[in-house]
Amino acid sequence: MGGEHSTARRDRILAAAEREFATHGLSGARVDRIAARAGVNKQLLFHYFGSKAGLHHAAIVAVLDRAQIRASAHGQPAERLRQLVGELQDVTAGSPALLTMMADANSAGVTDNSARAVDEWYARAIGSVRQILVDGQRSGHFRDDLDAAPIAELVVSASLGTVVPARSAEPSGSSKSRDQLRDTLVRLVVDYCAWR
């Protein structure tokens, strides 16, 4: 019972921390607000995470853990790319804290471990897209004279960025708008990579 209660408290603290850090960043976040929102005292917060920076790191890791993407190794490159872009959009739309906390990971006072966790997540996402592009080159679907790395980085950045206008364009959360943006991005990349 004690372990379950402890886990539930820790999870409440992390959920409150994600909201606070996503809203205010590391420098503007206040541990008293996090503790109040989680229904615990500040001492318990420090008991679990050691410091505000430790709590920030744990919150970033929790957000990134939920934002895992899985690239399919089967199918046509264009369809695999479409699926992966959709996954990137979905994890971003499903975790409003993701983009703000990723951006905050490069600010002053953030631990190297937090910045490294974000860099590793981003590198895995780029690697997944790059692999699809390389597979497309090997199978003859895409030109072999292209460097897949910068294209992959552009695809990941654009995929993550398409969620922001979709949120502001339609109040419902706008999966229709995200679908249109995803399809346009994939079409642009496939057209650029195609043999001419």
Question: Where does each model-flagged region fall?
Answer:
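C-terminal peripheral helix-coil segments that are non-catalytic and often amphipathic
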Residues: 87-94, 123-139, 154-196
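Helix-turn-helix
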Residues: 12, 16, 20-54, 58
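Amphipathic, non-transmembrane alpha-helical scaffold segments
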Residues: 56, 60, 103, 115-126, ...
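Short, basic, alpha-helical segments at the C-terminal edge of helix-turn-helix-like DNA-binding modules
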Residues: 61-66
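Amphipathic alpha-helical segments used for helix-helix packing
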Residues: 92-116, 164-168
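N-terminal intrinsically disordered/low-complexity leader segments
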Residues: 1-8, 168, 196
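All-alpha amphipathic helical-bundle segments outside canonical DNA-binding/catalytic cores
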Residues: 116-121, 138-154
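Hydrophobic alpha-helical connector segments
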Residues: 69-100, 148-155, 182
